[in-house]
């Protein structure tokens, strides 16, 4: 299974990079992981322009492949780790070999992105910094594959 994390901006904090490196290493036996960092347009005067520019970059990435696209979104579906593990197994069983997880920038994504994905996934009612969300997502991806492979990680 190919897992692509499509995200906006670069990670600036060492502790987040360290966590990302750790979970990336753990996943090598389960998946081929690719983290695609797109340009952050946060410095624009107009937030809507920033959102549109970042969203255009996301749309370019997801149109390049025949992947299943999952957007992390506050309006998405809430699902627990066990059921998400089953969901991914079902995707594999129907022939999907690549999943794009999309983390928008700090200002969110456009309606075009929201309308172009296969699933919107909500992690929590809480709001997380988008850079920290990358680490949280990688931990969960590892957890989902650990569950489906009967690895003693998930409790």
Curated annotation (Swiss-Prot):
Q: Which GO terms describe its cellular component?
A: cytoplasm
Q: What is this protein called?
A: Ribosomal RNA large subunit methyltransferase H
Q: Which PANTHER family match?
A: METHYLTRANSFERASE (PTHR33603), RIBOSOMAL RNA LARGE SUBUNIT METHYLTRANSFERASE H (PTHR33603:SF1)
Q: Which InterPro entries match?
A: Alpha/beta_knot_MTases, RlmH-like, tRNA_m1G_MTases_N
Query: Which cell locations does it reside in?
Result: Cytoplasm
What catalytic activity is recorded?
A: pseudouridine(1915) in 23S rRNA + S-adenosyl-L-methionine = N(3)-methylpseudouridine(1915) in 23S rRNA + S-adenosyl-L-homocysteine + H(+)
**Keywords, ordered alphabetically:** Cytoplasm, Methyltransferase, rRNA processing, S-adenosyl-L-methionine, Transferase
Which EC number(s) does UniProt give? 2.1.1.177
UniProt similarity note: Belongs to the RNA methyltransferase RlmH family.
Keyword Cell wall biogenesis/degradation belongs to the record = no
Q: Which of this chain's residues are annotated to bind S-adenosyl-L-methionine?
A: 72, 104
* Taxonomic source organism: Fusobacterium nucleatum subsp. nucleatum (strain ATCC 25586 / DSM 15643 / BCRC 10681 / CIP 101130 / JCM 8532 / KCTC 2640 / LMG 13131 / VPI 4355)
Q: Pfam families under this entry?
A: SPOUT_MTase (PF02590)
Q: Please give the chief subcellular localization of this protein.
A: cytoplasm
Q: Name one GO molecular function term.
A: rRNA (pseudouridine-N3-)-methyltransferase activity
Return the CDD domains for the record. Answer: RlmH-like (cd18081)
Partners and quaternary state? Homodimer.
The reply to whether Cytoplasm figures as a keyword in the UniProt entry is yes
The protein's role, per its UniProt record: Specifically methylates the pseudouridine at position 1915 (m3Psi1915) in 23S rRNA.
Q: Which domain of life is it from?
A: Bacteria
């Amino acid at each position: 299974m190919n897992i692509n994390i499509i995200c906006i901006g670069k990670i600036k904090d060492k502790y987040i990079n360290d966590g990302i490196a750790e979970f990336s290493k753990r996943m090598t036996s389960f998946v081929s992981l690719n983290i695609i960092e797109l340009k952050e347009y946060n410095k624009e005067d107009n937030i809507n322009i920033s959102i549109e520019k970042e969203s255009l970059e996301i749309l370019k990435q997801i149109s390049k492949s025949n992947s299943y696209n999952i957007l992390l979104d506050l309006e998405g579906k809430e699902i627990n780790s066990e059921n998400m593990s089953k969901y991914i197994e079902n995707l594999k069983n129907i022939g999907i070999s690549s999943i794009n997880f999309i983390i928008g920038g700090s200002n969110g994504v456009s309606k075009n992105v929201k309308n172009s994905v296969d699933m919107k996934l909500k992690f929590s009612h809480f709001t997380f910094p988008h850079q920290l969300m990358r680490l949280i997502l990688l931990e969960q991806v590892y957890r989902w594959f650990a569950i489906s492979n009967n690895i003693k990680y998930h409790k």
